């Protein structure tokens, strides 16, 4: 029974850590973090209360490891570089210089997966970290994801509308291809040579002579020499064609 009572605090620390450790401070203060109930601490882990204030994502991240040389190993990209140091040869007790955004829970992990936790509240973080315009570009992912989602929804809606209209409209008949008449090569027509009109009275073309009807009375009568006026005498006409 006495052994069980001695092991009870260790079992509770493994199950839920050290629930009584809580620290408050202002930016610029120095606070001490200690491992309570952990026999062989090997690393420290930090879960920020306002990760956007530091440009981080939610979740735990390691901030310190124990090493065989006695000098703790600090990750190069952790937010406590230059402000966190060990107070003993191990990593059981740490000193932290507070800064805005350091609020969160610090976990001290043991070799047998036991842990203790210390909750840190930095005064002013609730107001400072919720102010508009957080640093380190943390606002961009928060705006980019909704915009991408809205664009995806609009694109899918447009595709659905086009598909629905395409199904409702009757299919259009296929127009026949235009037909072209074969090209026939025609020879140019030669100009018709006009015949020259015949000139009446051309004796060379028409050797025959046609005589008009003569005055038979004048021909049947012998011509008399008369002293009468020549105008009174009968006239003989000849028509040459």
Curated annotation (Swiss-Prot):
GO terms for biological process: blood coagulation; erythrocyte differentiation; integrin-mediated signaling pathway; megakaryocyte development; megakaryocyte differentiation; negative regulation of signal transduction; platelet formation. The modification Phosphotyrosine is found at residue 211. Residues 1-17 form the signal peptide. Residues 18-142 are extracellular. Keywords: Cell membrane, Endoplasmic reticulum, Glycoprotein, Golgi apparatus, Heparin-binding, Membrane, Phosphoprotein, Receptor, Signal, Transmembrane, Transmembrane helix. A motif (ITIM motif) lies at residues 209-214, 235-240. The chain crosses the membrane at residues 143-163. Changing residue 237 to F: Abolishes the inhibitory effect against ligand-induced activation of PLCG2 by CLEC1B and GP6:FCER1G. GO terms for molecular function: heparin binding. Glycans are attached at residue 32. Expressed in platelets. Not detected in the monocyte-like cell line U-937, the B-cell-like cell line Raji, the fibroblast cell lines TK and HeLa, or the natural killer cell lines NKL, NK 62 and YT. Residues 164-241 are cytoplasmic. InterPro entries: G6B (IPR028070), G6B_V-set (IPR048308). It comes from the Eukaryota. GO terms for cellular component: cytosol; endoplasmic reticulum; Golgi apparatus; nucleoplasm; plasma membrane. All isoforms are N-glycosylated. Isoform E is O-glycosylated. It is linked to Thrombocytopenia, anemia, and myelofibrosis: An autosomal recessive disorder characterized by thrombocytopenia, increased number of giant platelets, and anemia manifesting in early childhood. Bone marrow biopsy shows increased number of megakaryocytes and reticular fibrosis consistent with myelofibrosis. Interacts (via ITIM motif) with PTPN6 and PTPN11. Binds to heparin. Inhibitory receptor that acts as a critical regulator of hematopoietic lineage differentiation, megakaryocyte function and platelet production. Inhibits platelet aggregation and activation by agonists such as ADP and collagen-related peptide. This regulation of megakaryocate function as well as platelet production ann activation is done through the inhibition (via the 2 ITIM motifs) of the receptors CLEC1B and GP6:FcRgamma signaling. Appears to operate in a calcium-independent manner. Isoform B, displayed in this entry, is the only isoform to contain both a transmembrane region and 2 immunoreceptor tyrosine-based inhibitor motifs (ITIMs) and, thus, the only one which probably has a role of inhibitory receptor. Isoform A may be the activating counterpart of isoform B. Isoform B, displayed in this entry, is the only one of the isoforms to contain both a transmembrane region and 2 copies of a cytoplasmic motif that is referred to as the immunoreceptor tyrosine-based inhibitor motif (ITIM). This motif is involved in modulation of cellular responses. The phosphorylated ITIM motif can bind the SH2 domain of several SH2-containing phosphatases. The 2 ITIM motifs of isoform B are required for the inhibition of CLEC1B and GP6:FCER1G signaling and platelet activation. This is Megakaryocyte and platelet inhibitory receptor G6b.
